[in-house]
Regions:
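Short, glycine/acidic-enriched loop or turn micro-motifs at the edges of active sites
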Residues: 51, 72, 170, 185, ...
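Short, polar loop motifs at secondary-structure junctions
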Residues: 50-55, 149-150, 217-223
């Protein structure tokens, strides 16, 4: 790690405002559900130790945010987003008909970003547009002018975010924060390159219990590595499918 973040209860000078929209889609992302079901942060720093598409942090982007992500591709996309200019985003063209992301001649990180927009709700960037994108179904959900405009209008608002390509147990934050812990789920999280089979959930449960501040942990209903309670029946990224979500919080009793 290049730094250790000890104290967290300081907000940035970044203007408050409405929530940010997702910078990219990701399998299991929580952006839609974050405002409906999960507690609001009560600390000046939000930490997502399994960052993915950072759906929770996007709802409170004016706060200090630390994203930890073990997958170098996901971490690379976030590192690109916190540095890229709006003009650079607007200059990225559409994928040509019958073509792939490789035809755009982009930097690796930019290609990864677009790869998440040509096929939504995946755990890895794709190169060829999905049939939904090719058929122009819901164009605002795939790479094109509307998405370019959205991302370019938001990148300046995450300049203060910190990104770490590291595992949850290597997170540099040691002080109080709002911890939004959304790991690959124990029974269903094998769709990821760095999936649930690589996680020691007993250790993760102990780690969650010893974080300072507010701790929010996500899982499927029925998981037992921490005493979860049923949260909600939610829509998934798979057409017509729903899932029963569970939650554990420390109720602010760790200070």
């Amino acid at each position: 790690m290049t730094e250790e973040i000890v104290s967290a209860d300081i907000e940035t000078n970044t203007p408050r405002g409405s929530k940010l929209r997702p910078f990219f889609g990701f399998y299991g992302g929580k952006w839609r559900d974050a405002a409906k079901y999960y507690p609001s942060p009560d600390h000046g720093l939000i930490v997502e130790p399994f960052a993915g598409s950072a759906g929770y942090a996007l709802r409170y982007a004016h706060k200090r945010v630390v994203l930890c992500e073990v997958d170098p591709i996901i971490a690379g996309v976030w590192e690109y987003l916190v540095e890229v200019s709006p003009r650079e985003i607007l200059a990225i063209p559409d994928v040509p008909a019958g073509g792939t992301v490789d035809d755009l001649g982009l930097t690796q990180e930019a290609a990864w970003l677009i790869g998440f927009w040509v096929n939504r709700g995946v755990s890895r960037p794709r190169k060829r547009p999905s049939k939904w994108m090719r058929d122009r179904i819901s164009p605002g959900s795939f790479w094109g002018n509307r998405v370019r405009q959205t991302i370019s209008s938001q990148v300046e608002r995450i300049r203060h975010w910190k990104i770490y390509n590291c595992s949850w147990n290597e997170c540099p934050v040691t002080g109080s924060a709002t911890w939004f812990v959304d790991p690959p789920y124990q029974k269903t999280g094998r769709h990821y390159v760095y999936g649930s089979e690589e996680i020691d959930f007993k250790d993760l449960g102990k780690w969650c219990r010893t974080r300072k501040g507010q701790v929010i942990v996500c899982e499927n209903h029925g998981a037992g590595w921490i005493p979860f309670r049923r949260l909600a029946d939610v829509k998934t990224t798979r057409a017509g499918k729903r899932a029963v979500e569970a939650i554990w919080t420390n109720n602010g009793d760790i200070q």
